[in-house]
Regions:
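Basic, Lys/Arg- and aromatic-enriched nucleic-acid-binding interface segment
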Residues: 1-28, 35-36, 47, 63-64, ...
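A short, basic/aromatic helix-end/turn motif that makes direct DNA contacts
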Residues: 27-33, 155-161, 171
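C-terminal secondary-structure termini that scaffold catalytic or DNA-interacting sites
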Residues: 37, 46, 50-73, 79, ...
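General beta-strand recognition
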Residues: 39-41
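Catalytic-site neighborhood detector that most strongly recognizes the C-terminal catalytic loop/helix
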Residues: 46, 158-183
Length: 193
């Protein structure tokens, strides 16, 4: 991934870091990104249907959330922002001005499915099992739960409408985390003499 084109590297970092849906990442706007603090606002999604083409719609839960990026993701996003500005300058009058962070070389919005195609090609090129963008969402959720992030915060970070949704989807990871908690509590007695 380190040698991947910066646009795709940044998209992948954000998918891994935030656990956002691919449409939410594709719908991220520069006006909702603070490159100083690393705070982003997820408040829409870029979607596609044959009848409408590419269009902006609400998030799945019709809500918004603020998220703080990891320093590594922020650094890669800043690299992409420089490349974005270079592309804008190179294209001049041909640049299609759109508000989105992730665009094609001419400034037009990326198709929401393009990340799936890119990751499929990346997997084939590097002879690794195919990774669907939604797998990063599951990884983010599992990582938060395994590291003790409470279910309400995990649900909020993922943009789930209810912690119950999160609990139902990640019941196995929650069971593992609870077993780990029991082991930690048992350790209190083991260390007493």
């Amino acid at each position: 991934l380190e040698k991947a084109p910066i646009r795709w590297k940044a998209i992948t970092y954000l998918l891994i870091d935030t656990g956002c849906r691919r449409g939410e990442i594709m719908g991220l706007k520069w006006s909702k990104v603070n490159l100083e603090t690393g705070l982003i606002i997820i408040d829409c999604a870029l979607l596609y249907t044959e009848s409408k083409g590419i269009y902006e719609g609400p998030t799945k839960t019709n809500d918004f959330r603020a998220m703080k990026l990891a320093p590594q993701s922020l650094a890669v996003l800043k690299e992409w922002q420089k490349e974005y500005e270079n592309l804008k300058e190179l294209n001049g009058d041909r640049w299609e001005d759109s508000p989105y962070v992730f665009v094609r070389d001419n400034g037009a919005p990326l198709h929401p499915d393009s990340i799936t195609r890119w990751q499929s090609n990346f997997s084939k090129k590097h002879d690794i099992p195919p990774i669907h963008p939604h797998a990063f969402r599951h990884t983010a959720a599992s990582t938060m739960i395994a590291n003790g992030v409470d279910i309400v915060t995990t649900a909020t970070e993922l943009g789930h409408s209810s912690p119950t949704t999160t609990a139902n989807m990640y019941a196995h990871q929650i069971a593992v985390a609870r077993a780990k908690a029991a082991d930690v509590r048992a350790g209190v007695f083991a260390n007493r003499k």
